[in-house]
Amino acid sequence: MTDSTIIYTHTDEAPALATYSFLPVIQAYASTAGVNVETRDISLAGRIIASFPEHLEEGQRIADALAELGELAKTPEANIIKLPNVSASIPQLKAAVAELQGQGYALPDYPDDPKSDEEREIRARYDKIKGSAVNPVLREGNSDRRAPASVKNYAKAHPHRMGAWTSESKTNVATMGADDFRSTEKSAVIAEAGTLRIEHVAADGATTVLRASVPVLAGEVVDASVLHVDALRTFLDAQIARAKAEDVLFSVHLKATMMKVSDPIVFGHVVRAFFPKTFAKYGEVLVAAGLSPNDGLGTILNGLDGVPHIGAEIKASFEAEIAEGPALAMVDSDKGITNLHVPSDVIVDASMPAMIRTSGHMWGPDGNEADTLAVLPDSSYAGVYQVVIDDCRVHGAFDPSTMGSVPNVGLMAQKAEEYGSHDKTFEIAAAGTVRLVDATGNTVLEQEVAAGDIFRACQTKDAPIQDWVKLAVTRARATGVPAVFWLDEGRAHDAQLIAKVKTYLAEYDTDGLTIEILSPVEATAYSLERIRRGEDTISVTGNVLRDYLTDLFPILELGTSAKMLSVVPLMNGGGLFETGAGGSAPKHVQQLVKENYLRWDSLGEFLALAVSFEHLATTTGNARAQVLADTLDRATGSFLNEDKSPSRKLGGIDNRGSHFYLALYWAQELAKQTDDAALATAFEALAKTLGEQEETIVGELIAVQGSPADIGGYYQPDAAKASAVMRPSATFNQAIATLA
């Protein structure tokens, strides 16, 4: 790999399809500056294939690209553009495996209930792939996310639709506030490097090692907390009754993708709580049939056909309890898909902002919007959303044409906090104590547990905390905007961080800067007050709030989080550039297959590519890469001003048309820039050709719409078929080829 190499990740679903169209343009333009753009396959299918080489024929095997990029991210040369990928739930994982098996890959099935060592090994490999398995590996730095000026200005000039709020809205957040992860949390700072052992000690003294070795560094913050399941069930029963009494929709909002151990278990308890009679009567039958509430109501209902004699009876019981209970929030009212069907369908960081943007409503079973009780069982961050809801109830909806912005500096590096806890999270088998023990036998932290409780330990290393504080000061200095650390002195982990933040802030010149430390609830209120005045406020947060807020505020400001600039300055000098904060849009793929129209908006890719070129220019001295960055910035501004994003309706341009217009504006900017005469000459002919052939090219791109498209697979499309579908304009393809 040369020092002028950019890695452009091949991922999943809509962004992967967009890559077939946009990557040839990127590679052609980059080649004029001596920049090599390579791909690495970190798609769900690719990660599955790479994990089972011994099961596959030689020609089917592929390298572990994620592991390779994880190592690259630790080097100064790293320049990685990361597109959104699938964080697979178990149903998605099984679907991907089935598709690959159908394509001739002799992969083992996912063992739901492994019986042998071989099955346990297979299960362990698959479990490493599921959930948010990609981002923690690549994120060897903290996060700097913000709306670029061009995007913010466009949103102000063309405000997206916001649902009206009334003071009578009955929408609220429900959260436990006791016996949950936040309220039970204990925290310690490690004095010297070593290892910890996580063990369970039963009432009779029997000790079971849950995790033999957890490496820790000096200065690291380690936490232990427990979610008590008896309290969870009592809480859920009360909220189901409350939703019924208040005549609002019942909904639960979790993060079963990233929190892939704890949240599917919590989701399963919600399903059980909503259908108490059915599980009391048929629970053992469902277990025997391998149907778990953790996988969602949809998986259970689909599996009832395989339950002899009483499958229909069980289905009727579920339907009766749906009729008796509060109305369920729906994912798809037309298809009868409820909030409880699939654990990964309602993801809190996307679902809560969407609800707030839509008058505090979700969709009900009758196909109409309605006020909603949003259940966020753990209280760590639930209060943030309640403050926003209360603010809208008093002041009405936000106005995108005037509101301020909340850029984020997020503590993320080296699997910080909850998002690195998967391998230290356990569903407890028996009552007792779980403790973290150091190499000398001293108990560092311990928690009393009952059977079924969920124990979780988290780690946050000191070097990332120092880097996070530095990044916060840097951004505050660069923008002149107040920076607020969202830390709660009443929470054990946050109290440790507050002490460190105060220590490390003292090392910087903060004269003239406004830097506050407020609890998440206080920080939300402070930021909202400024937003309504049109003022910006930097949120400096931990890993989870980084994730939540970089959806919440962009969705309110811009209508989407996919238009955010997401830069990860890697701690060893490289750069990771994430294309927006949105997901991978499965419904976009369904529409493409149905009618050959892809409404994916690649603005996030355009923004990330520009800062990637800029980083390359800075680190390697490649002046032409800087010209590419500057001209791409200006081209993106023209792209927005001319409104060339996908039209979202048949007969208008889609993702492919947006790539043409970006290529046109970029070529025009390159042709007229004066920093590099040779580059200007190289793009003169292309700019002329694309301009003259605009009508022909757009016609060719639109002509294919309206008929089904065959891409040869969902999780692993056929490359030739997908390329043919995504590059249907021979005129455009030939023009781009002239640069090679």
PLM features: residue spans?
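Short, charged, amphipathic alpha-helical segments
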Residues: A680-K688
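Extended, well-ordered protein cores
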Residues: T2-G268, K277-K500, Y504, Y508-W666, ...
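Intrinsically disordered, low-complexity regulatory segments in eukaryotic proteins
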Residues: A680, I697-V698
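Short, solvent-exposed positions on alpha-helices
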Residues: Q626, A677-T681
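A glycine-biased, small/acidic residue-tolerant capping/turn segment at secondary-structure junctions
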Residues: V698-Y714
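C-terminal accessory extensions/subdomains outside the catalytic/core fold
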Residues: P717-A740
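Ligand-binding pocket scaffold of soluble enzyme catalytic domains
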Residues: A671-T674
